[in-house]
UniProtKB/Swiss-Prot annotation:
Involved in mRNA splicing. Helps to stabilize the U1 snRNP-5' splice site interaction. Associates with snRNPs. Belongs to the SWT21 family. The gene is SWT21. This is Protein SWT21. It comes from Lachancea thermotolerans (strain ATCC 56472 / CBS 6340 / NRRL Y-8284). One of its GO terms (biological process) is mRNA processing. The keyword Nucleus applies. The keyword Nucleus applies. It is found in: Nucleus. It comes from the Eukaryota. Signal peptide: none annotated.
Length: 422
């Protein structure tokens, strides 16, 4: 068994099921950091719930639930992380100079409502000369999409700008379930009825929208026809994007023709009826293969982008992904990495991933099947590793989130963030 080398983590800051106590530990560690540094750190913003000791109505946040990271992103230069948590907190972490140091927020602020989805600008960095790219998008139910500042100098975090989500046909707010920057000054949003909406950062109203079918859907079909995720392009100016849905449909999005093109569905993917939607789309670095990660599934589907996205292979997991999403990462150095329910990391090597999950043919014999290349132990046994993200500047550094199963009442729950070296 291989073992990763832990570089940083959040220690026990988010352990347990007491949100107020976790905030208290976080504040104490931030004070220790400030006292031992000559740098002037921005003061951590407090939550309304912390200021009132939880005496305000808590119709959204459960103060006895574990604090879990729901979105984790690197800055483009690999010097910092942005993490969005289910306590409504947005935290920015600068990687410490000394290994083994606890991760303490450089900056923290709280939103007034939970985020359905969010994404940071692809050029974000705390070391940018300008704050133009130090922004993130966040969607919530019954609210416009909000553009929020991630500037280290920002003292207030009211939205910089808002984007309309009103359906022109019925004048109701549409919930945007997925967000992704499509280029430096525009983004895509995915909603119900398989609709993709495109925005320019400088305009309130959408610039175009398109859906992925010709006939209206009703009932259960309509509720599950939701754009659940977009691919993560390596080229921010790409004119071709891809989207998955909770019905396990996959679409190509041509930003030039402003149309969605059907690529695959539950039938062509040969999925069982209880498969509950696409959680992530990852392309191999050579763009030949699309890896499809699904909820309520024990396999990762491999589609051939050169052959009409036909399914050509499956990668088998040692566990079943449930309703709580698990987010993997893929890069040229590490190949495909995904966390497990018991604190391990599975790896399919790059030379396998770039050949559709098969080891390339050798003079001694044909291509070999898609078994896991390595299994890594971590320091987080007993917790699920629910997010992995490789550093854009040093892919050997992998950031991740670990947490308990949010649907189980485990009062010894351990949660937090880590950075490990593979």
């Amino acid at each position: 068994m291989n073992r990763v080398r832990k570089v940083y983590d959040t220690l026990d800051t988010f352990d347990g099921r007491d949100v107020l106590q976790s905030w208290k530990r976080e504040g104490s560690r931030w004070l220790d950091q400030v006292e031992n540094s000559t740098y002037q750190f921005p003061e951590l913003e407090s939550s309304n719930y912390e200021r009132t000791k939880g005496r305000v109505p808590t119709e959204h946040i459960d103060l006895r639930s574990p604090i879990i990271c729901t979105k984790l992103s690197w800055s483009q230069d690999g010097t910092s992380l942005v993490a969005v948590f289910n306590d409504y907190g947005v935290r920015q972490y600068l990687l410490p100079e000394e290994e083994g140091t606890g991760l303490v927020p450089f900056k923290r602020f709280f939103r007034a409502q939970p985020a359905v989805d969010c994404c940071i600008h692809p050029e974000y960095s705390l070391f940018n000369d300008s704050d133009a790219c130090n922004v993130m998008l966040a969607s919530s139910r019954d609210l416009p999409i909000q553009l929020l500042s991630l500037s280290p100098h920002a003292r207030e975090h009211r939205p910089l700008f808002s984007y309309s989500v009103v359906n022109a046909e019925n004048e109701r707010f549409e919930t945007m379930f997925s967000l992704s920057f499509s280029h430096y000054s525009g983004f895509l949003a995915g909603t119900s009825r398989n609709k993709v909406v495109a925005y320019d950062l400088n305009y309130k109203s959408p610039i175009w929208s398109s859906d992925g079918y010709g006939k209206p859907l009703r009932g259960t079909s309509a509720r599950r026809a939701i754009i659940s995720c977009f691919d993560s392009p390596s080229d921010s100016e790409s004119v071709l994007r891809y989207a998955g849905t909770y019905r396990c449909d996959i679409y190509g999005i041509d930003l030039r023709t402003k149309e969605l093109n059907f690529l695959a569905n539950k039938q062509t993917l040969e999925l069982k009826e209880n498969s509950a939607g696409v959680a992530e789309l990852l392309f191999s670095v050579n763009k030949h293969y699309l890896y499809v990660i699904k909820r309520n599934s024990q396999t990762i589907d491999v589609l051939d982008a050169r052959s009409s996205f036909a399914k050509i292979n499956e990668l088998y997991l040692s566990f079943r992904i449930g309703s709580q999403k698990i987010i993997a990462t893929l890069d040229l150095i590490n190949g495909l990495l995904i966390g497990t329910h018991d604190g391990k990391i599975l790896q399919w090597a790059s030379n396998m991933v770039e050949f559709g999950g098969l080891l390339p043919r050798t003079p001694e014999g044909p291509a070999k099947d898609s078994a896991v290349s390595k299994v890594f132990d971590t320091s987080y046994a007993g917790s699920r590793i629910n997010i992995l993200a490789s550093s854009p500047s040093n892919p050997h550094l992998i950031a991740g989130s670990f947490s308990p199963d949010k649907f189980e009442a485990d009062h010894t729950a351990k949660s937090g963030l880590f950075v490990v070296d593979l």
